[in-house]
Amino acid sequence: MTEEERLLSAASQEAEASIEKSLRPQFLAQYIGQDKVKQELTIYIEAAKNRNEALDHTLLYGPPGLGKTTMAMVIANEMNVNIRTTSGPAIERAGDLVAILNELEPGDVLFIDEIHRLPRVVEEMLYSAMEDFYIDIMVGQGTTAHPVHFPLPPFTLVGATTRAGMLSAPLRDRFGIISHMEYYQEQDLKEIVLRSADIFQTEIFEEGAFEIARRSRGTPRIANRLLKRVRDFAQVQSDGKIDRAIADKALTLLQVDHQGLDYVDQKLLKTMIDLYGGGPVGLSTLSVNIGEETETVEDMYEPYLIQKGFIKRTPRGRIATPFAYAHFGYDYLEGRKN
């Protein structure tokens, strides 16, 4: 199974792009959750507007699906400026970056998603652009080559990354604002589901929204995806209204349990417990047993299971925790004996 095929994937899926756009809040007052980030940005944006300056360069980092792209667009709206969006892999050469920078107006926001994937030559050109608002490029070849100085208007670079540790120190140090996007609380996710249902013109009860929220892995993108699937179920199997019972039936049909675990998550944990006494068990052995590539297990399944406390990584392999045993109604001490 690929990341794009998985219902509980936090990665953006191409088919969802237009729907995600319709669900995005436009301003900080509409943005649900991430209170610390919002409070800080409110101050920084207001101060920059009072001084009639561009906002400091801003780095947004955290797991996928938490609203980094949306926050970049909100920043541009709050500053009342245009935004140009691109991604690290899309800027292959220094010339690509020059073309983008030359289109910016004073105060504009340049949003670079997956900024940790910028080629080194492009990243190094960004240093002077971010710090002093100019770039130097070499024109000509051989003995006729000479640098050409291009001044740039003051602008705000908003970078987004799921892997802040992969950013080089020189690039990271040039961001004046660094904000960590965290997993959402269930109450905030419930409010997001209610808001999205209203946009979809779908009638939903609070307990139905909460049932979706608590199975959404703390991630708005997953919550909205599950809402769409539950909406389909409600329209075909019921009267179109989503209450707790309908949400539970739909999500159970989709094999998403109350902790947000899907079929493969459950299979992985049960394999560790039933076949290997809870571990330790090696990653390659686990992968063979559940029929997935080792990279898929490590990148797609393990992070959430570790974050929620279902498994632990040790030098000898993976171990199922008491929480994992309890989730399936197993006795931990008895299971470890076996």
Curated annotation (Swiss-Prot):
Residues holding Mg(2+): T69
Region annotated Large ATPase domain (RuvB-L), chain positions: 1-184
Pfam families, A to Z: AAA_lid_4, RuvB_C, RuvB_N
GO BP term, example: DNA recombination
Family that this chain belongs to: Belongs to the RuvB family.
Function of the protein: The RuvA-RuvB-RuvC complex processes Holliday junction (HJ) DNA during genetic recombination and DNA repair, while the RuvA-RuvB complex plays an important role in the rescue of blocked DNA replication forks via replication fork reversal (RFR). RuvA specifically binds to HJ cruciform DNA, conferring on it an open structure. The RuvB hexamer acts as an ATP-dependent pump, pulling dsDNA into and through the RuvAB complex. RuvB forms 2 homohexamers on either side of HJ DNA bound by 1 or 2 RuvA tetramers; 4 subunits per hexamer contact DNA at a time.
UniProt-listed PANTHER family: HOLLIDAY JUNCTION BRANCH MIGRATION COMPLEX SUBUNIT RUVB (PTHR42848:SF1), PTHR42848
Official protein name in the record: Holliday junction branch migration complex subunit RuvB
Organism: Enterococcus faecalis (strain ATCC 700802 / V583)
